[in-house]
């Protein structure tokens, strides 16, 4: 268990410990209803400071098999739903905050390589027998594991837009080639 794959860190508990918390666990009723459908790929694109990271932490705490969070969720809105235990702590979860990958990766252009390498290393700790020796692609690794075990993974990408945001910021804050030639 590591930083990305089935982390034992329950960041959602910190959210619940805060003085201000608005229960959005009702969203889990929806995500549970689409898990085994073609609608299972969900993109939560909202403005900054809209609670996306808290939602990502909630999804991780709810679905991850590395955590035991029944006591937490049974007291919240999702706990009132008929089948809230059906998917609770039943999945291998890979939770990646892209923003925190840029620096250790050595820059935005190395993030995918960094994620592939590190997540596959973590997967090997649990699924060594299921992975071919030279596996270097995360989609390939997940496909191999799923084919051999039948297990499903939940992949949560937080701050996925940081690469776009940062590139746009650089584009609009860097001097244009014309401006650079004038300043010489």
Language-model regions: role of each:
Residues 172-184:
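Single conserved hydrophobic/aromatic residue that forms the stacking wall/gate
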Residues 1-174:
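Phosphate-binding site recognition
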